[in-house]
Amino acid sequence: MKVDILSREYPPKVYGGAGVHAEELSKVLAERVDVTVRAFDGPRAENEIPEIPGDNPKGSLKVVGYDVPKELQEANGALKTFGVDLQIADDVDADIIHAHTWYACLAGYLAKMLHGTPLVITAHSLEPFRPWKREQLGGGYDLSSWAERDAYEHADRVIAVSAGMREDILSAYPNLDPDKVVVVHNGITMSQFETPSDDDPGWKVFERYNIDRNKPTLLFVGRITRQKGLPY
């Protein structure tokens, strides 16, 4: 089986959680199937492609990067995105398309129509719940919202990373068939989250902020952005 993962972000060009998600998903899938990641920000060098975990992977991992067409270098940000999406849609060659974020959703939807390939979308955020983006994109926000809505409403499956996200998806896009929206929680690689030894220098953070390391600690990890809901 061949899977094309479409993503705005992919190593080494990662600035948010969606990029981390796409990287980790691609590595795990590549243990089992042939994966091609189609991402923004231009070609990747061979040494920038993540290694497939495991001793005997049955699949493969390939990364194809795309640049904004030179004719659109000075265009609105949404139009730059669409310029990359058109290139990706033309190149898709897979049994399943898996798109992430609105940046790549239009490419997935166009490829679905062009090639007849089933489209899966993972929701990391939703344009209707980020109205402040109009400050950044102007009328381009209407374009990004349109692209996301059309892609979601025509996807064969939409993955929500939580029950709350599923509710938001159905609220934002009431025309979407609820049976197509499923919850798949984010996972972690447990070996990367082992409790450090007592002499690990990382414990100095607890000392610096006077945190009792013997008590449970609630930690938030995320970008400082309005959509995260932190009022400080």
Outline where the language-model segments fall.
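N-terminal subdomain of nucleotide-sugar transferases
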Residues: 1-53
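Conserved donor-binding/catalytic core segment of Leloir-type glycosyltransferases
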Residues: 4, 212-228
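A short, charged, and often flexible helix/loop element on the N-terminal side
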Residues: 55-92, 135-136
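A short beta-strand/loop micro-motif in the catalytic core of glycosyltransferases
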Residues: 97-98, 153-163
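Short His-centered aromatic/hydrophobic patch
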Residues: 99-104, 123
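Nucleotide-sugar donor phosphate/pyrophosphate-binding loop at the beta->alpha transition
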Residues: 117-120, 128-150, 167
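Carbohydrate-associated surface elements
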Residues: 164, 187
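A short helix/loop element that forms part of the nucleotide-sugar donor recognition site in Leloir-type
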Residues: 194-211
